[in-house]
Amino acid sequence: MLPIAILGGTFDPVHNGHLRVAWEAAEALDAQVRLMPAHVPPHKPAPLASAAQRVDMLERSLAGQSRLVVDTRELRREGASYTVDTLRGLRAEFGEAQPLILLVGADAFGSLPTWREWRQLFRLAHIVMLTRPGRTEPWSGELVGEAVPRRARSPRELQDTPAGKVLSIPVTPLDISASQVRALLATGREPRWLVPEPLLADPAILAPYRQQR
């Protein structure tokens, strides 16, 4: 069964680093990847762009292909965006047999014990770490105890079961950040080659970041 993977974030704005990671994960896992903009991230400042503006940027960026899609369920939920609630919603919608995958960076994986109901994440989905060459993150003892016995040897194992496996896949380390893009726009510069080309087609699309000046 084709897995459904989720990649969360504020996407404020979406940039080429987000899209490259999502595409590489889709190909490596033979999965549909859903990019999920967060409503109110628990550990980050509120986004500069509105929810509607961030969705519009994502939809423009993903036009013309079907492997990466936008999922707005977190924006429709009031309050903070907690991953465990999102996974419960996906599980209820797609059923117990559907393979679900949570995509996280290696740094985020290392911090899982600080997440709400973090042990439940392994019961609701597989967790795939997106790793970059030369970077390692320490794991706490409780995370080692939860994750190591769940390690998968190949993406195929994630297709054969609905949840509970841990896998690492390497991704291209594009050195791009949303804060970098926002800083360029705030000083009147263009983030060409850093953001998807459709975002540069109309000055109004990136206006929320230019208006910081």
Please provide the spans of the model-predicted regions.
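Nucleotidyltransferase catalytic core that binds NTPs
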Residues: 1-213
